């Protein structure tokens, strides 16, 4: 009998993003604050014994072998020496290029699912180290706790912060992270701050002015949302968000936005819904 497992891949928000400088290797030193949303993709896994890794859901513009889900599965297979394979199906709800972690979250869910399915017994640090090879945002998803991040985003300090409801607007654009970080007008000299300063409200997203200038759709979404709540870009975008004390208020503002704007309302969470689900597994 085959072993099956279904797990969520939650979205995240960058509640702020400060860029401190550029390193010699081209990567940027940054500080950010990650919090999860109770909203995301869903992945379904079925173990197979012939060692093959197959993703049965096509993603437009992403070749099968380049998909982070496949790369995560094969990377874990190689690193662990497991002879097992897997069939994977993806229910895609999170946008690509949205700044809410869709690809990184899918990769993290794949690593944790296969650690369970293949009975590898890897600990959190080992999985996070493998995840970092796939992308700087993957470890925050494998660890599953809201975190203050430094370095290129891989140095994580868990935090316990308020868990409001969020209204997230999804402009219909695919923002290129590489393009934003290479923009000559990007602020790269923000001073380092303490997480307490962020909670007191002294923060911003250094990428936001560049994204607004390059992507009118994002600028327009921010203008519309700012009429009702203080709005901000998450990551390099293009999703923008505002926070609310309860679902009713978030839903009320959502109903006032133009019909053409794609959006969703979700609860913020300091423990990802993926990790809450994993805790229920035997």
From Swiss-Prot:
UniProt keyword S-adenosyl-L-methionine, yes or no: no
Keyword Flavoprotein assigned: no
Catalyses which reaction(s): 4-CDP-2-C-methyl-D-erythritol + ATP = 4-CDP-2-C-methyl-D-erythritol 2-phosphate + ADP + H(+)
Catalytic-site annotation from UniProt: 12, 137
Positions that bind ATP: 95-105
Pathway terms, separated by semicolons: Isoprenoid biosynthesis; isopentenyl diphosphate biosynthesis via DXP pathway; isopentenyl diphosphate from 1-deoxy-D-xylulose 5-phosphate: step 3/6
Keywords per UniProt: ATP-binding, Isoprene biosynthesis, Kinase, Nucleotide-binding, Transferase
Entries under InterPro entries matching the protein: GHMP_kinase_C_dom, GHMP_kinase_C_sf, GHMP_kinase_N_dom, IspE, Ribosomal_Su5_D2-typ_SF, Ribsml_uS5_D2-typ_fold_subgr
Class of the enzyme per the UniProt entry, highest EC level: transferase
Protein family per UniProt: Belongs to the GHMP kinase family. IspE subfamily.
HAMAP family (alphabetical): IspE
Function: Catalyzes the phosphorylation of the position 2 hydroxy group of 4-diphosphocytidyl-2C-methyl-D-erythritol.
Protein name: 4-diphosphocytidyl-2-C-methyl-D-erythritol kinase
